[in-house]
From Swiss-Prot:
It catalyses: L-tyrosine = 3-amino-3-(4-hydroxyphenyl)propanoate; L-tyrosine = (E)-4-coumarate + NH4(+). GO terms for biological process: toxin biosynthetic process. The keyword Lyase applies. The gene is cmdF. It holds the Pfam family Lyase_aromatic. Changing E399M: Loss of aminomutase and ammonia-lyase activity. It comes from Chondromyces crocatus. PANTHER family: HISTIDINE AMMONIA-LYASE. This is Tyrosine 2,3-aminomutase. Has aminomutase and, to a lesser extent, ammonia-lyase activity. Primarily, catalyzes the rearrangement of L-tyrosine to R-beta-tyrosine, which is incorporated into secondary metabolites called chondramides. The aminomutase activity mainly produces R-beta-tyrosine but also S-beta tyrosine in smaller amounts. Does not accept D-tyrosine, L-histidine or L-phenylalanine as substrates. One of its GO terms (molecular function) is L-tyrosine 2,3-aminomutase activity. InterPro entries: Aromatic_Lyase (IPR001106), Fumarase/histidase_N (IPR024083), L-Aspartase-like (IPR008948), Phe/His_NH3-lyase_AS (IPR022313), Tyr_aminomutase (IPR022314). There is a cross-link at A140-G142 (5-imidazolinone (Ala-Gly)).
Length: 531
């Protein structure tokens, strides 16, 4: 994958993170990087006042630093700001963070050295992953703390995850024949003053969110058939006047997934049955025919449509940030001068992740309510209470499974609260309004994990209902899904420890084979979600 600074998508990030794709640096952009670096070093030697080149940092900006302290200044910055806490990011997220930082530096406005970008690329290609604690970023001035842990590794200090082991960075670099960086003017600040931690984490979360969206479409088509729902609410003619592309797409995809089902009902048939039962006389007659289903069956395009459109909006903001210069100060060729500003501020990513978190939470809200309708004996049609295959009462069936989904759905309501408006001042009130973007991105990752559990629990319940109703009556895509899943998840009929069943289904829906199943049966070409 060629890194130019301008053309990465969240799916490129996924290739580097999950498929361990390697990167190469665009030669023309390397020339630009070299020019900006040379200019930065020349200005530093000439003692031109430039923030972070020959001044203190943050509120200490009035302090001029003589050029003989250039390396000490940058190393002090990195060591003092490698102050993260909590559990470390997973290796795939670390790869995304490094890729985001590399792409930013390759734009050539930061003053980074060619050696810096080459070593960062080597870390990605060789699978050398700095250990980055998740806590510690305010999201402005960028992600100082998490990125300092990357910078620490690049100068040969700290620890890295390498080939499944956490080791001292210096030992790994010696084994791999790599030389630690020697930092010149702005060499440390260039690495840490930006939004790359929140952006990398957001890219990973957004990719997972799109998978959850597709999963929710499939689960809904399964759920509608389990309860004999009507296909009428998914007819295209009813959605075009609403004017929202996401809603039209969701209705279209569910129509396709329902085609060929023997379990769904047709609206015209429902009307005929209602007339037949009422006798069309003068008496008030309760026909027992529901022309309209409950919202979990009927309003899915109006619920998941906004989710898709919100994900697409968040993707626009996150990918623009991914391909941006989010550093300070910036180094320009023409005219030869610097720009002192605040491109490190993470408000775009913070707000994008807040929107993303609401959208992902809504997927979970819908799935949990669908699960409730599927197991509730008062509203689940002819299915047994809590999907117990026999002897309901003696057997509990999916009673405990609902508790899992409902408890997580409640937890998600707290996680979905916005972080981007929860600013607290710091750094001697220099950083007096911050984005908390990394906090929001971390919540995005957690929400995707949580909602994945809810949706996979719903799919497990639908699979159980499929065993009860007869899989041969479902539409071909769902019949295929049940067939694949049933190889490892048979009819649940003995109240064995149900968490094992849920773990099996969770692993199944997150696997490559299931992702291929989604691609086969879902055509999202009309939206950026399909890229």
């Amino acid at each position: 994958m060629k890194i130019t600074g301008s053309n990465l998508s969240i799916y490129d990030v996924a290739d580097v993170c999950m498929k361990r794709a390697t990167v190469e640096l665009d030669p023309s952009q390397l020339e630009r990087v070299a020019v900006a670096h040379e200019r930065t070093q020349a200005w530093g030697e000439a003692q031109h006042p430039i923030y972070g080149v020959n001044t203190g940092f943050g509120e200490l900006v009035p302090v001029m630093i003589p050029r003989q302290h250039k390396r000490e200044l940058q190393e002090n910055l990195i060591r003092s700001h490698a102050a993260g806490g909590g559990e470390p990011f997973a290796d795939d997220v670390v790869r995304a963070i490094m890729l985001a930082r590399l792409n930013c530096l390759m734009k050539g406005y930061s003053g980074a050295s060619v050696e810096t970008v080459k070593l960062l690329a080597e870390f990605i290609n060789r699978g050398i992953h700095p250990v980055i604690p998740q806590q510690g970023s305010l999201g402005a001035s960028g992600d100082l703390s998490p990125l300092s842990h990357i910078a620490l590794a690049l100068i040969g200090e700290g620890t890295v995850s390498f080939k499944g082991q956490v080791r001292k960075t210096g030992d790994v670099l010696r084994e791999e024949g790599l030389k630690p960086l020697e930092l010149g003017f702005k060499g440390g600040l260039t690495l840490i003053n930006g939004t790359s931690a929140m952006t990398g984490a957001a890219c990973v979360a957004l990719g997972r969110a799109y998978h959850l969206f597709r999963l929710a479409l499939l689960a809904t088509a399964d759920f509608v058939q389990c309860l004999g729902g009507s296909t009428g609410p998914f007819e295209e003619r009813g959605h075009l006047p609403k004017n929202h592309s996401g809603q039209v797409i969701v209705a279209r995809e569910i129509r396709k997934l329902l085609a060929g089902s023997q379990l769904t009902s047709d609206h015209q048939d429902l009307m005929k049955e209602m007339v037949a039962r009422s006798g069309v006389g003068n008496d008030v007659v309760d026909t027992g025919v529901y022309l309209q289903d409950a919202y979990t069956l009927r309003a899915v395009p109006q619920i998941l449509g906004p989710v898709l459109d919100t994900l697409d909006f968040a993707r626009k903001l996150i990918e623009e940030e991914l391909n941006s210069t989010n550093d300070n100060p910036l180094i320009f060729d023409v005219p030869e001068q610097t720009f002192h500003g605040a491109n490190f501020h993470g408000q775009y990513v913070a707000m994008a992740c807040d929107y993303l978190n609401i959208a992902v939470t809504e997927i979970g809200v819908l799935a949990e309510r669908q699960l409730n309708r599927l197991v509730d004996p008062n509203i689940n049609g002819k299915l047994p209470p809590f999907l117990a295959s026999a002897h309901s009462g003696l057997l509990c069936g999916f009673e405990g499974g609902q508790y899992l989904a409902t408890s997580i759905a409640s937890e998600n309501l707290d996680l979905a609260a916005p972080s981007s408006i929860k600013s607290l001042p710091s750094n001697g009130s220099n950083q007096d309004v911050v984005s908390m973007g990394t906090t929001s991105a971390r919540k995005s990752l957690r929400l995707c994990e949580n909602v994945g559990t809810i949706v996979s629990t719903l799919i497990a319940a639908c699979n159980q209902a499929g065993h009860i109703l007869g899989n041969e009556r479902f539409s071909p895509p769902i019949r295929e899904l049940h067939g694949e899943l049933s190889r490892s998840v048979p009819l649940y009929q003995d109240d064995s420890p149900i968490f094992e069943l849920f773990q099996t289904v969770r692993a199944f829906v997150g696997g490559d084979g299931f992702r291929a199943h989604l691609v086969t049966h879902l055509d999202l070409a009309a939206t950026t979600a399909s890229s």
